[in-house]
Regions:
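Glycine-rich phosphate-binding loops of nucleotide-dependent enzymes
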Residues: 1-201
């Protein structure tokens, strides 16, 4: 609903004070909201550099052209390089995205998500399928890259949620059973029963 992929049947959605209900996803993106998907979403045959560059071109209002030397645009080149440095994938810049490890693909997708300079970033299960070490690295990356932005994250791994969130809403079978600070959520008996299990007692 918020990102425009499903149109609301009632009510209104506001982003930075502006009504965005009914706008198309790319229009909402241009207004400052960017999101990732649970299923990795990128151009598998394009290189890491080209994937990020596409996102930067879109964000800066340039149209991608296969016959235009887009690398001649200094602001696009510099922004692309900065993002690759930020996500620690500069050394993989010439590798097709489809050949990256799963964890690297998720890191690339986070880079693509922030390329627009969005003030609101939505991430859907960003650590799903990762090892413990990969998850810790992803959480550190997300925390660093979303500093100064609003982060909305959907995640089943409660350690990830507690590591990133200032405020948490817990959803069970389509219903919010609790909302509050991480400490309030830790103490909530309904949350303990639904998610945290015996270790929370």
């Amino acid at each position: 609903l918020i990102s425009g992929h499903i149109e609301p049947t009632a009510g209104e959605i506001r982003l930075n004070g502006d009504e965005i209900s009914g706008l198309r996803p790319f229009e909402i993106n241009r207004r400052g909201l960017s999101r990732s998907f649970q299923v990795t979403n990128m151009f598998a045959r394009m290189t890491v550099w080209e994937n990020v560059r596409c996102a930067v071109l879109w964000a800066t209002g340039h149209r991608y052209s296969f016959w235009k030397n887009v690398d001649s645009l200094p602001e696009v080149r510099e922004r692309t390089a900065q993002i690759l440095d930020d996500i620690h994938l500069m050394h993989r810049r010439d590798v097709p995205a489809g050949l990256l490890t799963y964890a690297e693909q998720r890191e690339l997708e986070i880079g693509i998500t922030i390329a627009s300079g969005a003030t609101v970033v939505m991430l859907d299960e960003p650590t799903a399928g990762m090892s413990h070490a990969e998850t810790e690295r992803a959480v550190s990356l997300i925390r660093r890259l979303t500093e100064g932005r609003t982060l909305v994250i959907v995640e089943h791994d409660m350690s990830v949620v507690f590591g990133l969130a200032d405020r948490i809403s817990v959803l069970v079978y389509g219903h919010i059973i609790a909302s509050g600070t991480p400490e309030e959520i830790r103490r909530d008996p309904k949350v303990k029963e639904a998610y945290l299990g015996e270790e929370a007692h």
